[in-house]
Amino acid sequence: MKQIIRLITTLLLLSLIGITCAAVAKLHETDKKFKGVELPEKFLDDFNLEVGKLQYANLFRSKKDDITHSAGEIRIDQQGSFSRGEKKKKFKVYNLQAQTNGKSSKTVAHVEVFDTIDAKTKAEQNEVLALAKEAFTKSKDSGKLYQVIPN
């Protein structure tokens, strides 16, 4: 419950910040559906807890890893990164997925974060983090890939 309150508080604060300064990033809903599973109601608290544990620096790690060090039924994995763009304008995209734990893990949310987001200040980094958290929730609800892209 504390994690949910913290997430809501963060989103509210960032919406206020967005009023006073230009946003460095935005959400993009793609048409791409991922082959995942609908999150069972009993796992919803674990999902919210894991999303709440996300940190800005972990969004941009290349190492494939459980970036939230989950103990519950859901984990958030860094699935690696890949390049996009043309030769002179290549950039990295970081592939993050919320998955069920266990032998036959299934994706329940899929988010990509572009490394071309220019978040220099703590406020801008908090904005990007809040967008990533929102992207996980929207992806879980829609079954679609969400991207956090430069504004």
UniProtKB/Swiss-Prot annotation:
Instruction: Cite a single GO BP annotation.
Output: adenylate cyclase-activating G protein-coupled cAMP receptor signaling pathway
Q: Which UniProt keywords apply?
A: Differentiation, Endoplasmic reticulum, Signal, Vacuole
Q: Which InterPro entries match?
A: Diff-assoc_signaling
Main location, first listed in the record: endoplasmic reticulum
GO cellular component, alphabetical, reads: endoplasmic reticulum; secretory granule; vacuole
State its location(s): Endoplasmic reticulum; Vacuole
Would you say which domain of life the source belongs to? Eukaryota
Q: Where is the signal peptide?
A: 1-22
Protein role: Has an essential role in the initiation of differentiation. Also required for cAMP signaling.
Full protein name: Differentiation-associated protein 2
Please spell out the taxonomic lineage of the organism that makes this protein.
Eukaryota, Amoebozoa, Evosea, Eumycetozoa, Dictyostelia
